[in-house]
Amino acid sequence: MGIDFVNKRALLILLFLSLSLQLFAHGDLSMRIAEKTVAISEDPNNAELYYERGLLYQEHIEYANALEDYHKSQALGNTDKAVYYSIAELHYLTEDYNEALKSIGTYLQVDSIDVRAKKLEAQILFQLQSYKKSLEAYRYVIHTMTDIRPEDILEYCDIILAENHKNHKAALEAIQAGLDQLGPHTLSLQLKKLDYLKESGQTEKALEQYNYFILQYNRKEFWYYKKAKFLAEINKPHEAFISLKLATVAIEQLKPKFKNMSPVVKLKEQINSLESSINNQKS
């Protein structure tokens, strides 16, 4: 009897896989979905099984099937807050932001201080262009999250500037707080700091930021050129010319194998082009 049951279970899994193999891109997920489907066929009133299969469908980007399983799980009595989060996340991924906001709102009624949920709420509000509310929610995330990442800081800055496109002061403060927390040489934050300094017209601080990159990184030739290009843009041709010469010197100091690499060859062309442009402006 036990062997017959095992054989029947294996047959059901193989049958499910053979019918749906073309629909599934990832073998491991396909197998796990198949196993959940067999388990549901054996225990059709198990709310947790439907929720678990819904998560697998969502991971497999089969959103309609995932949503159907989430609702079925709820209909069978699953009132856990995690279902509301998953539904909110799914609606967010499918760009149904109003429904996403309803679901995450229900979740937050149960657990108002959950950082992950507050972050999703902020992201949903951002897509709904409710920037002030989005900023409030994400501010809570930034001040509460213990495992903050550079991309969290950058997303927060995007919301700050969406709420007020001139508020580079707050964005730069957020970047600095991120650097203090994650380390002063966090590249993505330092790059964004340079962007914000340039966008806000803080030319001297932007030049200091270029100097930071020149001092910090071995391949100085690229940063000398970028600095020269910026100097030319702000009408400082003499300083730009000096920076181009320093870029050329840095290239000459490279080992032969690096000098002949296509990015360096292209950089030489860009240096020559910018030098010509500066000389033409002088004459």
Task: Please place each PLM-identified region on the residue numbering.
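Canonical tetratricopeptide repeat
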Residues: 52, 86-89, 120, 155-156, ...
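Terminal, low-structured helical/coil segments at or just beyond the last alpha-helical repeat
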Residues: 184, 208, 230, 241-283
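N-terminal leader/linker segments that initiate helical-solenoid repeat arrays
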Residues: 23-71, 75, 262-282
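Structural marker of alpha-solenoid helical repeat scaffolds
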Residues: 42, 76-77, 110, 144-145, ...
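Register position in tetratricopeptide repeats
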Residues: 59, 93-94, 127-128, 161-164, ...
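Canonical positions in the second alpha-helix
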Residues: 39, 72-74, 106-107, 140-142, ...
